[in-house]
Amino acid sequence: MRKSVCPKQKFFFSAFPFFFFFCVFPLISRTGQEKLLFDQKYKIIKGEKKEKKKNQRANRREHQQKREIMRFKKSFTCIDMHTEGEAARIVTSGLPHIPGSNMAEKKAYLQENMDYLRRGIMLEPRGHDDMFGAFLFDPIEEGADLGMVFMDTGGYLNMCGHNSIAAVTAAVETGIVSVPAKATNVPVVLDTPAGLVRGTAHLQSGTESEVSNASIINVPSFLYQQDVVVVLPKPYGEVRVDIAFGGNFFAIVPAEQLGIDISVQNLSRLQEAGELLRTEINRSVKVQHPQLPHINTVDCVEIYGPPTNPEANYKNVVIFGNRQADRSPCGTGTSAKMATLYAKGQLRIGETFVYESILGSLFQGRVLGEERIPGVKVPVTKDAEEGMLVVTAEITGKAFIMGFNTMLFDPTDPFKNGFTLKQ
């Protein structure tokens, strides 16, 4: 016989689905949502704690590094580069305030008051006997992006082509100057002791800041004096040189007059002859830039001869500093050589001139134009009223960043200010 269901049971079974759907299910659903939210919040909190610990460890490391550096009296950051083989160490920070109303005055102040910095950065143990570099400054001249004072193991230079090419490259590749969107050529203007140098970084196709090569438009260059006779000790004897300006004054001499072929094997002889020639020409010949009073010495000797590379017009080695030999074709030397050839009618405006270094690396150069400066004359000027002939020279080469360096000067280090074994 079938059992009858009491009204209460009947109501319970009929009402249960509604009760579950409207009362129990929301509770279960809410519990699941709360659990999900809790898990998400837990993960966020856990991630924040992990990030906080990571930051704390990084801060402790940074603080420890600062404590370690604090015991050093001086520290400098540098970009180490080379241009066609020649070193270019660019000091980007660490200098105290250097007074001066222009780069020439800053150069003079460094030379007279803080030359130990140059020695410490250029010479051993941080550098070497053929090191080259520059101090980077905020520009003073209007329109410039960077200020530069150039240095080597022997002192300071008013201008340097290979280091200017390096600076233009570094300025773009490290973000010192901004690169416009879709740019292919980026202008970088340098404020130097010799004047404004206008550079251009040529970007690799499809890249935003990778420089394929760089060009500089140098300060006005000119032939200063022609066929100057200089008598050197044996075995060299009497030689004839041209004196030209390309940012620095150069004594330009054919290698055949010295009886030395331009090769790495003959480097020590080339250095000896170059140093002898520079010393004698500064002793016996007075030079003076007609517009820049602080430029009044021959700083470099440019020895040139037949090229090895069929693409080149000539091959050279430039001796400067403390008997240093330029590994690149020398940018200011290329400018001086082109100014000399142009004055002699042996190079035309716009004609490509290729100079080869002792390593075999190349600079491409062009004379972009000429100008006469009325009332200004140098020894080769025939007509004072017509004025001195100057040319605008462009040099193109390739520079590479090799590393970023922090140099520390330990006050207890007996060699902190550098040394050289070269006598």
UniProtKB/Swiss-Prot annotation:
GO cellular component: cytoplasm; extracellular region; membrane
Keyword Glycoprotein among UniProt keywords: yes
Entry keyword Membrane: yes
Biophysicochemical property: pH dependence: Optimum pH is 5.5-7.0.
Residues of the signal peptide: 1-31
A Gene Ontology molecular function term of the record: proline racemase activity
Coiled-coil annotated residue ranges, if any: none
Swiss-Prot/TrEMBL keywords: Cytoplasm, Developmental protein, Glycoprotein, Isomerase, Membrane, Secreted, Signal
A Pfam cross-reference name: Pro_racemase
Residues of the active site: C160, C330
Gene3D superfamilies linked to this entry: Diaminopimelate Epimerase, Chain A, domain 1
Subunit-structure text: Homodimer.
Function: Catalyzes the interconversion of L- and D-proline. Secreted isoform 1 contributes to parasite immune evasion by acting as a B-cell mitogen. Probably involved in parasite differentiation and infectivity.
PANTHER family: BIFUNCTIONAL TRANS-3-HYDROXY-L-PROLINE DEHYDRATASE_2-EPIMERASE, TRANS-3-HYDROXY-L-PROLINE DEHYDRATASE
Protein's recorded name: Proline racemase A
Record organism: Trypanosoma cruzi (strain CL Brener)
Lineage start: Eukaryota, Discoba, Euglenozoa, Kinetoplastea, Metakinetoplastina
